[in-house]
């Protein structure tokens, strides 16, 4: 899991250090950098090759000039770095990009390996110079010492040679980070519910289409784990007043390929999921994925979309309990104070506390660019910091906007 992020000269950020805890609520106005941070964390987490970043594959991040900091006087480069925990060890990684005919191209890559930092610097002849330097234990200090002033030994390889090292797994140049993916990320708008589904196995997709098939498998193969998932899902439905229970109905036979429907129970009445409120179809994939996973980082933009306040509170409760019981971690981009406050309430009253930390990352836009205020949430549910006045103003403004509806 990525535990720290550094962004320099990228989008609206300049030399910004961001801690990443087990539970992170990303809060702030539009265009303050929340999606930028979530996109960047996902991009780094799913990177396969240190010299190739696909900025426009999963998210449309634009060309070099879209990404370089428009507030900066120096628009020739941008960089980002991270601290990642791998097998209980902290590893550091850093990339620097310049303009290549409008595309963002890696010109320098640094990472820790074997108690040293290796630096790969790309040259105009497509060769890559290899440097080493001592490695600091502190991420911030490591970033400060990542300039050429601290480089030591040097060697030169062709880019093809380095790519060969990557393919054969030279651990001194390309550590395990390139094959270890920890994050699942949902899209801001989940798939619309269907009147019926064709049952076949499907892997995770950001829109949540796969959830119906997983739920059917839970009903087909009842055991302790699947019963727990179904019971917790029904409990959430009752606490949120969204539904009282979930059932699966097969249309022809009981085979794995039979079409089926997802029905929601309201007392003695069953209603097809496609005929209930839109908020149910938006939150159902989130809940099921949270319940089926353990020790997974889950990124969710706008989990509260189309949910009334009671359901937003129930979701805050579920996030807390799922973190505690399943050891999942969260990146939640949200405008819901109901969700955050219910999470803090659960933290305050829980006898069994989760392992790890939680925080609010409050994003603001200033004349000099985007800034982030880190607001740790203590084990007593209270903020362990001075709360900015603008944080309270943000939620008041959100409430005032609702008066226009």
Describe the residue ranges of each PLM region.
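Switch/communication elements of ASCE P-loop NTPase nucleotide-binding domains
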Residues: 1-70, 83-85, 226-232, 242-405
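Intrinsically disordered, low-complexity regions
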Residues: 63, 103, 162, 170, ...
């Amino acid at each position: 899991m990525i535990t720290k992020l550094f962004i320099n000269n990228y989008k609206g950020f300049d030399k910004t250090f961001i801690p990443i805890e087990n539970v992170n609520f990303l809060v702030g106005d539009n265009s303050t950098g929340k999606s930028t941070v979530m996109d960047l964390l996902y991009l780094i987490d799913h990177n396969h090759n240190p010299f190739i970043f696909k900025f426009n594959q999963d998210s449309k991040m634009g060309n070099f000039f879209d990404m370089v900091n428009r507030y900066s006087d120096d628009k020739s480069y941008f960089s980002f770095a991270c601290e990642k925990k791998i097998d209980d060890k902290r590893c550091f990684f850093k990339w620097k990009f310049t303009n290549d005919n409008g595309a963002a191209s890696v010109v320098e890559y640094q990472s820790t390996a074997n108690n040293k930092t290796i630096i790969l610097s790309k040259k105009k002849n497509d060769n890559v110079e290899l440097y080493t330097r001592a490695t600091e234990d502190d991420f911030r200090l490591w970033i400060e010492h990542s300039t050429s002033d601290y480089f030591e030994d040097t060697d030169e390889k062709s880019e093809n040679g380095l790519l060969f090292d990557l393919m054969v797994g030279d651990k001194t140049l390309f550590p395990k980070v390139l094959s270890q993916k920890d994050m699942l990320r949902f899209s801001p708008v989940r798939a619309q519910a269907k009147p019926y589904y064709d049952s076949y196995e499907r892997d995770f997709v950001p829109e949540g289409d796969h959830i119906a098939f997983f739920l059917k498998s839970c009903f087909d193969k009842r055991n302790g784990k699947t019963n727990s998932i179904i019971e917790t899902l029904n409990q959430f439905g009752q606490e949120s007043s969204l539904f009282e229970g979930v059932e699966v109905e097969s249309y022809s036979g009981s085979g794995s390929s039979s079409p089926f429907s997802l029905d929601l129970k309201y007392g003695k009445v069953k209603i097809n999921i496609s005929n209930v409120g839109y908020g149910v179809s938006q939150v159902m994939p989130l809940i099921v994925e949270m319940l089926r996973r353990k020790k997974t980082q889950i990124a969710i933009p706008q989990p509260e979309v189309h949910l009334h306040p009671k359901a937003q509170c129930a979701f805050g409760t579920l996030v807390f309990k799922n973190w505690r019981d399943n050891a999942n971690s969260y990146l939640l981009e949200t405008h819901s104070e109901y969700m955050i406050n219910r999470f803090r309430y659960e933290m305050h009253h829980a006898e069994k506390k989760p392992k790890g930390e939680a925080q609010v990352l409050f994003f603001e836009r200033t004349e000099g660019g985007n800034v982030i205020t880190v607001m740790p949430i203590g084990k007593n549910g209270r903020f362990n910091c001075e709360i900015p006045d603008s944080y309270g103003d943000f939620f008041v403004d959100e409430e005032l906007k609702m008066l226009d509806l």
